[in-house]
């Protein structure tokens, strides 16, 4: 469509960090050229024009928009992480109406940056909330939410107390399931297990909903598959326990219970469901996935 950089050194460096996103018929992407480095650009297919939306980080270093979050369109704005050279990597937004970009929250004061979305990405929920992981320098890497309606950014819990990280959403990214937002997180007491936020609660706070492998060992929800599956008020995912190994599990948002749905491979080795089928797939109301029963292979 166009050549943004006139230098062969930067050729092909389009959508390298944040990918592509569309908002109100405009295509947004990160692009690199020698004078401003990597910044947020836009292209209009209506008139064939392209432009740099804003130079968030002045100079040739570039802000690398979307490097950990991607570019997320929601509520009439574009949301992403960026580095302005002063605050480090933080959450930003771009408003196409005003044509300006602004920092949403400086969660880690100073130049270090909170590095939002490194493990979970930036996940839009119900066209209002943005869920992500971040490190504010006090609590370690924990779950955060930004409410695009109120403009508030809040910590959802110190799951792993102190400055140790809980790595929320690392295995099972934030998923909207009924009245809950479900994800995995880790602490020293329970290991890596399934956690949730009740969207109907006045004050959102993360709580553990299932200790699949009881004690400090980890159930590792969704560790063996690429993508869990949400059907109605349930989410299906792989998880392991001491007796059955890695098998198919579900969480019921209404009853707030976890259930092992199968023992495909008897014994503690497990069938590793979804490991080679890119997770679980809804086909006419049935869940299709790969598994190894120990006899026929995957």
Segments from the language model and where they lie:
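Feature 14080 marks short, conserved micro-sites in well-ordered regions
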Residues: 1-298
């Amino acid at each position: 469509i166009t050549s943004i950089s006139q230098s062969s050194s930067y050729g092909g460096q389009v959508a390298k960090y944040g990918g592509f996103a569309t908002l109100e018929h405009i295509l947004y992407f990160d692009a690199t050229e020698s004078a401003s480095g990597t910044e947020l650009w836009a292209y209009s297919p209506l008139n064939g024009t392209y432009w740099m939306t804003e130079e968030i980080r002045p100079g040739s270093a570039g802000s690398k928009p979307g490097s950990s979050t991607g570019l997320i369109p929601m509520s009439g704005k574009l949301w992403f992480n960026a580095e302005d050279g002063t605050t480090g990597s933080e959450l930003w937004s771009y408003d196409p109406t005003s044509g300006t970009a602004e920092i949403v929250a400086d969660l880690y004061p100073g130049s270090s940056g909170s590095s939002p979305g490194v493990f979970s990405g930036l996940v839009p929920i119900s066209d209002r909330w943005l869920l992500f992981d971040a490190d504010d320098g006090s609590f370690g890497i924990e779950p955060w939410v930004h409410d695009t309606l109120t403009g508030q950014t809040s910590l959802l819990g110190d799951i792993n107390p102190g400055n140790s990280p809980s790595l929320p959403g690392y295995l099972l990214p934030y998923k909207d399931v009924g009245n809950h937002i479900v994800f995995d997180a880790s602490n020293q007491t329970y290991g890596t297990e399934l956690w949730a936020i009740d969207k109907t609660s006045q004050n959102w706070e993360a709580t553990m909903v299932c200790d699949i492998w009881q004690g400090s060992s980890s159930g590792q929800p969704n560790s063996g598959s690429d993508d869990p599956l949400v059907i109605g008020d349930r989410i299906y995912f792989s998880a392991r326990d001491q007796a059955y190994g890695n098998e198919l599990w579900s969480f019921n948002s209404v009853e707030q219970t976890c259930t092992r749905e199968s023992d495909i491979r008897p014994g503690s080795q497990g069938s590793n469901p979804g490991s080679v089928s890119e997770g679980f797939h809804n086909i006419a109301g049935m869940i299709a996935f790969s598994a190894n029963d120990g006899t026929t292979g995957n």
